[in-house]
Amino acid sequence: MVDYTRIRLHGFNNLTKSLSFNIYDVCYAKTEAQRRAYIEYIDEEYNAERLTEILTNVAEIIGANVLNVARQDYDPQGASVTILISEGPVSPEEAEESAEARPGPLPDDVVAHLDKSHITVHTYPEMHPDKGVSTFRADIDVSTCGVISPLTALNYLIHSFDSDIVTMDYRVRGFTRDVEGHKHFIDHEINSIQNYLSEDTKERYQTLDVNVYQENIFHTKMILREFDLDNYLFGESSADLDEEEANTIRRHLRREMMEIFAGRNLPANQEV
């Protein structure tokens, strides 16, 4: 096994590391008024200002300098933020830490010190007009050129959003040379994105990996293990529902979540 912490590079580290992080929050809102209220709530909870704060903390975690911030709230709903970043000097200790496959910090652990390419986020609130199911999706992309991997921000991102389903894609492209001229197509150890998840996250979520190791492509998706109907009802409680209605709503929500997790529509007669 290559000891990535001891590779001496010739010139700049030319590897590009990209993390795509997609979260889904699912909700049931029975009436048209409740559905509108849910969309308004999500639109306010994850507006451009809040998303800018999250992405700025991501920049801090990966050790990047923020060069420019562009953000926009959209009408009727949705928001996007793009942050241009640049790599700064990386200490030997930071380089060694980035080569290790381990979870990054949690939101409460982030303290400031900034000095890679770009970070973007887009939000997509939507709702089903008949079955009452509403879904909020946020897409975050972190792309860096240099030593530190965007995976160090993964733990923070998961804890920053209230996510029912999460899909993550990580890839490394390009190569860098050591002082002897040998090419290195990856500069840190990894066999799964799960290496970077904290233990509490692994306990809360069921996970599935699809990895193409020889191409440096890693994919992990997660869905919450526990299902409590009250966590998904907007504007009412399960105590307000009779048993038949509660079971119907539960089936609608579980089907929505499993189809998002599977990435396809499931047969109508398939139990979920």
Curated annotation (Swiss-Prot):
Catalytic reaction equation(s): S-adenosyl-L-methionine + H(+) = S-adenosyl 3-(methylsulfanyl)propylamine + CO2
Record-annotated site: Cleavage (non-hydrolytic): 116-117
Protein name listed in UniProt: S-adenosylmethionine decarboxylase proenzyme
Sequence similarity: Belongs to the prokaryotic AdoMetDC family. Type 2 subfamily.
Residues the record marks as active site: 117, 122, 145
Reported cofactor(s): pyruvate
InterPro entries linked to this entry: AdoMetDC_fam_prok, S-AdoMet_deCO2ase_bac, S-AdoMet_deCO2ase_core
Pfam families named in the record: AdoMet_dc
Gene3D superfamilies per the UniProt record, alphabetical: S-adenosylmethionine decarboxylase
PTM comment text: Is synthesized initially as an inactive proenzyme. Formation of the active enzyme involves a self-maturation process in which the active site pyruvoyl group is generated from an internal serine residue via an autocatalytic post-translational modification. Two non-identical subunits are generated from the proenzyme in this reaction, and the pyruvate is formed at the N-terminus of the alpha chain, which is derived from the carboxyl end of the proenzyme.
Gene Ontology annotations for the cellular component aspect, listed alphabetically: cytosol
Matches recorded under PANTHER family: S-ADENOSYLMETHIONINE DECARBOXYLASE PROENZYME (PTHR33866:SF1)
Enzyme category, top tier: lyase
Positions carrying Pyruvic acid (Ser): 117
GO molecular function: adenosylmethionine decarboxylase activity
Biological-process GO terms, alphabetical: spermidine biosynthetic process
EC annotation from Swiss-Prot or TrEMBL: 4.1.1.50
Record flagged with keyword ATP-binding: no
Entry function: Catalyzes the decarboxylation of S-adenosylmethionine to S-adenosylmethioninamine (dcAdoMet), the propylamine donor required for the synthesis of the polyamines spermine and spermidine from the diamine putrescine.
Manner of cofactor binding, per the entry note: Binds 1 pyruvoyl group covalently per subunit.
UniProt source species: Halorhodospira halophila (strain DSM 244 / SL1)
Pathway: Amine and polyamine biosynthesis; S-adenosylmethioninamine biosynthesis; S-adenosylmethioninamine from S-adenosyl-L-methionine: step 1/1
